[in-house]
Amino acid sequence: RCLQLEPYNEVCQYMKGLSHVAMGQFYEGIKAQTKVMLNDPLPGQKASPEYLKVKYLREYSRYLHAHLDIPLTEYNIDLDLPGNFKDHWAKNLPFLIENYEEQPGLQPHIKDVLFQNFESYKPGVQELVCVADHLGSMMQYETPGFLPNKRIHRAMGLATLEVMQAVQRTWANSKVRMNGKTRLMQWRDMFDIAVKWRRIADPDQPVLWLDQMPARSLSRGFNNHINLIRGQVINMRYLEYFEKILHFIKDRILVYHGANNPKGLLEVREALEKVHKVEDLLPIMKQFNSKTRDGFTVNTKVPSLKDQGKEYDGFTITITGDKVGNILFSVETQTTEERTQLYHAEIDALYKDLTAKGKILILSAELGEVDAVCNLILSLVYYFYNLMPLSRGSSVIAYSVIMGALMASGKEVSGKIPKGKANLTLLRFQLVDFEAMTAPGSEAFSKIARSWMNLKSISPSYKSLPSVSETFPTLRTMIEVLNTDSSHCLKKTIVVV
């Protein structure tokens, strides 16, 4: 419809190409992408976001098409795609890659994905899809700036079920096949299940492991950056967290002055008590610290469970500007090689403990064991959230792993993510990733998450669902199930409700 109204609209043309590729119609998709590529900006004209992204999408589309019918366990996108391509794509840089060898063109013998009627699936698979739709809807953020996406819901619901089944097999001492090898599952394999579903649900976004980027990129650091306030623009998604971050900054300022300016601490404290907005912090900082000039940064710390007393770098809060209306208030995590290794060691230790306790749990489902396993799952994902190891999608990927691993332990999440401030104690947050990033430790995150997850014993009917990995072993089968219309799921009785 958009192109009917404006045949040469670049955004519409790009979205047409993206939509076709997402649904497995690669020939039409790449044709539309090529039209955008031919739309070179004029000399001195700034390239549009669509023009910058389209060549990455075309190359990725070719790769996906070539792998449509190859079992997903036999290859690895992070290892297959060239390092510089991944680095430039994740950073949204112009496609200027030296010695880049294009992906092969579309092969005629590999056909596009055909539409699959819901009724053509066996009853068990239909039930699987309906359950996935329900589970995926539980991950929706009910906050301004986050619109529901039913395709993502289904993909991450299926990811949750596949994680559940894979973790159960691991605790029963079964091996999994990943990247062409059969072995015991590690924590990254667990997250990779969710990664593959998130990738195929929206091929527009580069969902890539940052530690698999080229060494040069890692040595410089890879930043996940979020602007909270930029000039007159306020990021509504994170508005609920402004007050919490403001209190944290005030505390850090007091600690700093307590160590470096103890005589002036009372005056600083009195001045900070009058500050109720982030924008008002800059004048205060300039007044009491000549080094502040046009801005300052505050770093958060993440306490280790493995090594008591040790702390890791969390995220950095930056406030710059010279007056109200010209302020930049942002947060970012810097993924360096050293920081990544520290977090990996923490997650490795938690996963080892989780696997050991999971194996005991299968033999003896005592309440104490279940509780310990639940806390380990939430602690492990707490460090994943703070590491932010993916270029995109870390939040929903981590949450689907939480839900799937909890289901493997015999518990399921029945409570939805809260809409906002229900009261002044527990039910006050909206974004699970930001709650983990601003929590003082893994125990605090586990406590507040469990307060609204409303964990209950899992329905026995989950055991009768078919294997997700065996039912959808290729990209083609994954795209087919994401495309299928399941509107009559609403008319059926879903096993989980």
PLM segments and residue spans:
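Canonical positions in the second alpha-helix
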Residues: C2, K35-V36
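FIC/Doc superfamily catalytic core
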Residues: K53-V497
